[in-house]
Design a protein with these regions (language model features):
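Conserved GNAT acetyl-CoA-binding A-motif
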Residues: 103-114, 241-252
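Conserved acetyl-CoA-binding loop-helix of GNAT-fold acetyltransferases
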Residues: 82, 88-101, 124-128, 224-239
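Amide-forming acyltransferase catalytic core, primarily the GNAT-like/NAT-type
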Residues: 34, 129-212
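Conserved beta-strand in the GNAT
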Residues: 53, 60-69, 76-81, 194, ...
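Residue-level recognition of the GNAT/N-acetyltransferase active site
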Residues: 78, 83, 87, 116, ...
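Conserved active-site alpha-helix within GNAT-family acetyltransferase domains
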Residues: 89, 93, 117-135, 253-270
Length: 279
């Protein structure tokens, strides 16, 4: 009835078409092109050899997928879905249990994912299959401020200047997409600014732009004589000067950047659960 195949570079266009179809009606629709998939593949450590496509019947109709990322002994479901007409048929359970078996056999110790908190059926499905909610991720709209920043912002700072010890010293709690591996591997057109006060570096900011928004990837404090909240307030004023709505997405609630944004008037427009399973 069901068969599974691993992903491959030759199947990328078929994978993106299937994923886009399944997620077209979701709160956050996915609209991958081959090019954007390859960018996400690099940034999020997607491994096609660990990703699976689910087929139905002798004609091998593609009906579902699990796109999987991997770092060390940790695996992550980047996206998981079944075509609408095959839901409630047992296909989801067949796929997820085969994913568990395959990853455990390959030596992975844990599997994590993010799911939109209002998608109660999806949340219940993952809980029934052994996942536990580890924390909540908030996406913010940051209020517009007058662009009267007091610090200096120099462009073309290298991403390679950000190291794991910077996050540790600042007591950060990054999610998968903000881990140093994601930042170093990313091929996306991000901007990196060095933030300076009185000829001294106090922080770095990684950010990007779309046609509709400016978005913060992260703000890294490198000098601890300046309050992190002051750095964030100034950085958001700087980014507001580009004249587009300012957002940041999937920010863990136990991360200091989340607390500063929340207490300074930013509004949550989406919440996700980060969930984890021991394999």
């Amino acid at each position: 009835m069901y068969t599974l195949q691993y992903g491959s570079k030759e199947k990328i266009e078929n994978i993106t078409e299937l994923v886009n179809e399944v997620f077209k009606d979701y709160v956050i629709p996915i609209n991958w092109t081959k090019e954007s998939f390859l960018l996400d593949m690099a940034e999020n450590s997607i491994i096609l050899d660990h990703s699976q496509i689910l087929y139905f019947g002798n004609e091998k109709l593609p009906i579902g997928f699990c796109i999987t990322s991997a770092r060390g002994k940790r695996a992550r479901i980047d996206s998981f879905g079944i075509k609408n007409e095959f839901r409630k048929t047992g296909a989801s359970y067949f796929l997820i249990n085969n994913v568990f078996y395959d990853l455990a056999k390959k030596g992975f110790s844990s599997l994590q994912l993010e799911v939109e908190s209002s998608q109660t059926r999806a949340v219940d499905f993952y809980i029934k299959n052994g996942f536990k909610i580890s924390r909540t991720l908030d996406s913010f709209i940051i209020p517009e401020k007058t662009s009267c920043h007091k610090f200096n912002y120099s462009l073309n700072c290298s991403k390679s200047s950000i190291h794991h010890d910077v996050l540790l010293k600042a007591k950060r709690a990054p999610n998968w997409q903000r881990e140093i591996t994601s930042i170093q591997n990313s091929k996306k057109d991000y901007f990196m600014n060095q933030i300076r006060s009185e000829d001294k570096e106090i922080a770095k900011i990684l950010w990007g732009r779309t046609e509709d928004t400016t978005y913060i990837v992260d703000i890294y404090q490198t000098d601890f004589t300046t309050e992190y909240s002051d750095i964030i307030q100034d950085a958001t004023s700087y980014l507001n000067s580009f004249g587009k709505p300012l957002i940041t997405v999937s920010l863990p609630q136990n991360d200091p950047l989340n607390y500063v944004l929340l207490t300074s008037g930013s509004k949550i427009f989406l919440q996700q659960y980060e969930m984890i399973l021991s394999l």
